[in-house]
């Protein structure tokens, strides 16, 4: 595929016109022959195992199956690059063009696009201002729609007629004393009728009329008008025509995107799309032949309906009617199934690509970590930071080349861990938890090597990640360049993301175990009597006594304290004074739990 040099700002998805669909697949050969239309349902010849000409894998349309080799074998090797074989019409080029060259199927009768007919909302019924049920009846040949009422008094534009009503009006036209004048094709059924109705819409004038009606309407009618106007405005803005929602040609995607591969036993495995395309081509060819021999209307009509259903199944199998199934009664995967959903092309392959220097594991709580740290399993770290470790090993002279360094890592040599420790110091990693719904769903941390296979996460950042420890997994990414490392450290480090970008309020707040722990340390418990009333000269003495089991965590004790004390209860404070009234010592009533709580806060404030 030629490399695109020009830069672009965005990609726009819009409806393709029939001319554009054909232009995607059409090419003119040097001899003037135009190729691109797929006319045969065959895939490959069962004897030669070569693609059939004008079939779904045709080399003339899609390019050669082998690099630099035409179909008939007249031209081989790269020196014939760009030559089109006079005998078989295949261009001598790389086989990878079969990944992007398209074809098309010219339909013998128009068919509606099932997305625009059966989608929610149905754009075809919205634009035509007709109920979806009525539009479906016309499309699937259950009713006629009046396209030109002529001078008939009991007929009006877009009126639905049953078969009997249509025959009755036809009889009136050909009656001897009839004054009824109706043009040929005054009523039709099928996608052809919908195509004519959509083509008759003058978008600008219709939009103006709707805007005028909006001022006078209320309630449900107004809502309906707004919906129609919005669709019309979008068509006008994109330069699309409503009749393009009815297909007269359908694109055939490149053959390498719907491959056919030979299995060990000589059988073939093929993409479901090939079966769906084959159904469309078979029915299309049969319809063309029936029209050629002027078959009865009822037979042609039935074939048109079957063609409509085949195209529906190709675009979105199961959206309407019976689901087309293959072997083992398995529903065939249509184009929509390939695109949509979690396993679809966009979410699986385009938005969610696998990247190098990344890994994922289950998260567990790391209560001893600092806010900006995360525990990274050694097994994962050595794999993620392998290029840096190899570079450092060679730099230190421990090994001479990359191969030797890799062998050293595989042997789990004890020396690699000190090197790894040096490498990860100051090198932040990014942690991401899906779904990343806001920017705090991915944050930077300084890795700390831990044993085990789980990533350790600081409990305070759980709110930002919406994480809990019931089996959640997180992905680790290593920023490689110095710029990305600096950006991660300055902008994305967890300790720099204290406030929520949505509300501006703190998002790093104590929850669950932390709140319970703080409450338990500082709560009053009258039942805790062991060691109650004892005096201690320092907080360290009190904690030692608790550790030795001499006092309870919640027992009321007296602690010597030299600072200023504010209390609502004078009984919680005891001061010893000398004869002159000067304070000799001061004791406050507290608990060991409150002493521990106070110590932790004091240490944190001093450290910061």
Curated annotation (Swiss-Prot):
Protein residues bound to Mg(2+): 468, 470, 472
Cofactor dependence: Mg(2+); Zn(2+)
Molecular function as annotated in GO: DNA binding; DNA-directed RNA polymerase activity; magnesium ion binding; zinc ion binding
A Gene Ontology BP annotation from the UniProt entry: DNA-templated transcription
Chemical reaction(s) catalysed: RNA(n) + a ribonucleoside 5'-triphosphate = RNA(n+1) + diphosphate
GO cellular component, one term: DNA-directed RNA polymerase complex
Subunit (UniProt): In cyanobacteria the RNAP catalytic core is composed of 2 alpha, 1 beta, 1 beta', 1 gamma and 1 omega subunit. When a sigma factor is associated with the core the holoenzyme is formed, which can initiate transcription.
HAMAP family referenced in this protein's UniProt entry, alphabetically: RNApol_bact_RpoC1 (MF_01323)
Protein name as catalogued: DNA-directed RNA polymerase subunit gamma
Encoding gene (name): rpoC1
């Amino acid at each position: 595929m030629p490399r695109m040099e020009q830069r672009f700002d965005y990609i726009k998805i819009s409806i393709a016109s029939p001319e554009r669909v054909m232009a995607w697949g059409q090419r003119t050969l040097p001899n003037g022959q135009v190729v691109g239309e797929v006319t045969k349902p065959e895939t490959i010849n069962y004897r030669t195992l070569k693609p059939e000409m004008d079939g779904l894998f045709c080399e003339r349309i899609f390019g050669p199956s082998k690099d630099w080799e035409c179909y008939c074998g007249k031209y081989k090797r790269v020196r014939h690059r760009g030559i089109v074989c006079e005998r078989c019409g295949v261009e001598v080029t790389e086989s990878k063009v079969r990944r992007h060259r398209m074809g098309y199927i010219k339909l013998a009768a128009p068919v509606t696009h099932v997305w625009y007919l059966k989608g929610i909302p149905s754009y075809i019924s919205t634009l035509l201002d007709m109920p979806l049920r009525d539009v479906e009846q016309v499309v699937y040949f259950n009713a006629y729609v009046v396209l030109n009422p002529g001078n008939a008094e009991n007929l009006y534009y877009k009126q639905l007629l049953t078969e009997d009503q249509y025959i009755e009006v036809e009889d009136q036209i050909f009656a001897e004393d009839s004054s009824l004048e109706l043009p040929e094709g005054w009523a039709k059924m099928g996608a052809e009728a919908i195509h004519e109705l959509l083509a008759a819409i003058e978008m600008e004038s219709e939009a103006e009329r709707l805007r005028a009606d909006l001022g006078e309407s209320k309630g449900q009618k107004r809502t309906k008008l707004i919906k129609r106007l919005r669709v019309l405005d979008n068509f006008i803005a994109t330069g699309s025509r409503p009749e393009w929602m009815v297909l007269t040609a359908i694109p055939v995607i490149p053959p390498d995107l719907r491959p056919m591969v030979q299995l060990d036993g000589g059988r073939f495995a093929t993409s479901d799309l090939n079966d769906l395309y084959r159904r469309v081509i078979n029915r299309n060819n049969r319809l063309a032949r029936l029209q050629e021999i002027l078959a009865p209307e009822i037979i042609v009509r039935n074939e048109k309906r079957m063609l409509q259903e085949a195209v529906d199944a190709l675009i979105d199998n199961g959206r309407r009617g019976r689901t087309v199934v293959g072997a083992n009664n398995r529903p065939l995967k249509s184009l929509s199934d390939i695109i949509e959903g979690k396993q679809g092309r966009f979410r699986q392959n385009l938005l969610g690509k696998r990247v190098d220097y990344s890994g994922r594991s289950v998260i567990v709580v790391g209560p001893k970590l600092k806010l900006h740290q995360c525990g990274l399993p050694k097994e994962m770290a050595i794999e993620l930071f392998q290029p840096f470790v190899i570079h450092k090993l060679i730099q230190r002279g421990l090994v001479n080349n990359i191969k030797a360094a890799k062998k050293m890592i595989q042997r789990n040599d004890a020396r690699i861990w000190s090197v790894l420790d040096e490498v990860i110091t100051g090198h932040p990693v990014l942690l991401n938890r899906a779904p990343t719904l806001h920017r705090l769903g991915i944050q930077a941390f300084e890795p700390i090597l831990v044993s085990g296979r789980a990533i350790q996460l600081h409990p305070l950042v759980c709110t930002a990640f919406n994480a809990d420890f019931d089996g959640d997994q997180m992905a680790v990414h290593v920023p490689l360049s110095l710029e990305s490392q600096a950006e991660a450290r300055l902008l994305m480090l967890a300790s720099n993301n204290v406030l929520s970008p949505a509300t501006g309020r703190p998002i790093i707040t104590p929850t669950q175990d932390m709140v319970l722990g703080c409450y338990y340390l500082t709560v009053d418990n009258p039942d805790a009597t062991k060691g109650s009333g004892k005096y201690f000269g320092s907080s360290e003495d009190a904690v030692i006594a608790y550790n030795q089991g001499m006092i309870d965590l919640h027992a009321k004790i007296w602690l010597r304290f030299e600072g200023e004390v504010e209390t609502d209860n004078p009984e919680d404070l005891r001061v010893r004074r000398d004869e002159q009234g000067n304070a000799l010592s001061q004791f406050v009533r507290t608990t060991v739990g409150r002493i521990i709580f106070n110590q932790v806060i004091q240490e944190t404030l001093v450290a910061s």
